[in-house]
A protein has these predicted regions:
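Acidic, surface-exposed loops and disordered segments
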Residues: 1-137
Length: 137
């Protein structure tokens, strides 16, 4: 069994006594062993799986639970190549089967307010910053 100090060492390459004697829960183990893999199988991601993963992402808490972002699903190889050109050090992007772009979306809550018959009074820098943070989460 891997200990928390061993997991911290593997993650950050530092020796520490933090977590000594504490049993790692599945959540702690999952978070500390997380890593990014940017090698992809040469196959499409099932549409239903993308929908489920997006539902999970949109279930994460955000500022006031407003979900002030929109998600653009990119599958087109030409569009992915153009995005790769705009983003340095993303050689992996064009080879990804699907690429998700999270965008701060102030217009989303404006439209919800209009739909429900309310005035959208928070059209200001604070709303922009909240939307940006929501997209980044």
């Amino acid at each position: 069994m891997t200990t928390i100090p061993e997991m911290i060492h593997a993650r950050f390459a530092i020796d520490t006594a933090r977590g000594t004697g504490i049993t790692a829960s599945e959540t702690i183990e999952c978070v500390l062993s997380r890593r990014a893999v940017r090698r992809y199988k040469d196959e499409e991601v099932q549409e239903g799986l993308v929908d489920v993963l997006l539902a999970c992402a949109q279930s994460a808490p955000t500022k006031s639970n407003l979900q002030q972002y929109s998600i653009i699903i990119v599958r087109d190889p030409i569009v992915k190549s153009k995005l790769q050109e705009l983003c340095p050090k993303t050689d992996w992007l064009a080879s990804s089967p699907v690429f998700l772009v999270f965008c701060a979306d102030m217009r989303r809550n404006q439209r919800i307010s209009e739909f429900r018959g309310y005035e959208h009074a928070n059209n200001n820098l604070d709303t922009f910053l909240n939307a940006t943070v929501d997209a980044a989460l």
